[in-house]
Structure formats: structure tokens, C-alpha cells
UniProtKB/Swiss-Prot annotation:
HAMAP family according to UniProt: Ribosomal_uL13
GO cellular component: cytosolic large ribosomal subunit
Lineage: Bacteria, Pseudomonadati, Pseudomonadota, Alphaproteobacteria, Rhodobacterales
UniProtKB keywords: Ribonucleoprotein, Ribosomal protein
MF GO annotations: mRNA binding; structural constituent of ribosome
Biological processes, Gene Ontology terms: negative regulation of translation; translation
Subunit organization: Part of the 50S ribosomal subunit.
Annotated region described as Disordered, given as residue ranges: 129-152
One Pfam family in the UniProt entry: Ribosomal_L13
Protein purpose: This protein is one of the early assembly proteins of the 50S ribosomal subunit, although it is not seen to bind rRNA by itself. It is important during the early stages of 50S assembly.
Family recorded in the similarity comment: Belongs to the universal ribosomal protein uL13 family.
Name of the molecule in the record: Large ribosomal subunit protein uL13
Amino acid sequence: MKTFSATPADIDKKWILIDAEGVVLGRLASIVAMRLRGKHKASFTPHMDMGDNVIVINADKVQITGKKREEHFYWHTGHPGGIKSRTKQQILEGAHPERVVYQAVKRMLPGNRLSRQQMTNLRIYAGTEHPHEAQAPEVLDVKSMNKKNTRS
């Protein structure tokens, strides 16, 4: 039997809505990355963008375990003495709290052109409102998938 290799005509993209309120960040990012790549489908083909379109709401209410809220992100501006840092807590309380979820998902995908294309299928919103009601997204309840996905 020949190995199945999907063609662009075989790809069926769905819209998935995930509520991130109270969900552990790493577990959420792992589930979202798997959906973006399409590894949950039996027809998965590694070189094709066959994942679903994923909408994540309430990204500002994501749960972070342990002392990871106090861990620093470091970057350099390129200027002398230009080392900068922020904690996850500062980012979540800042203007763009959805960036914590975005970076977690991005770092769970391979670092190639295909994963950059797959990241365009991810939409993250800090609040409950999103402009994708017309796509009729299917709700994926991450909390009920496993009791370890949420932390009280």
C-alpha cells in the first residue's frame, strides 16, 4: 500500500475557537500548535499546510504555573548597553498580553517557512470579543480534555 500524501485539493481547514481562561499556558500552546500543523488529522502530510484556523480568546487570563510569572524575557536593542528585559507578569498586565501565548505557540513549532505560514492561521485576542463570528468556529473545550489542563 502506498503512503498517502495530501494535495491542496484534499485539505479541509476548519475554524476552531479556544477559550484560554484558566488554562495552563504550556498545555494550551501544545494543543494549539498541534491543531495549526494538522497533526490531529489522519491525513497529516508534513510538507503541507493542512492545519486548522485557530482563534484563542481570553489570552490575558491564561494560567502560568510555578514561578514562571517572574521569569524574565531578555532582548538586545543593538545599541551599547541596550539589554532589555520584561517578566511574563509585566507582559500580561501590559498593552499586548496575547504575546505570551503567541510566543509559546511559535516556539512549539519548527523554525521553518512552513511554520511561519501556519502561524498566519492563528488569531489571539486578549478579551472575549473576536471578529470571526461569520466563520462559525467550532468550540474546543481544552479544560475538559484533561484535568491537568487547568489550575485553580
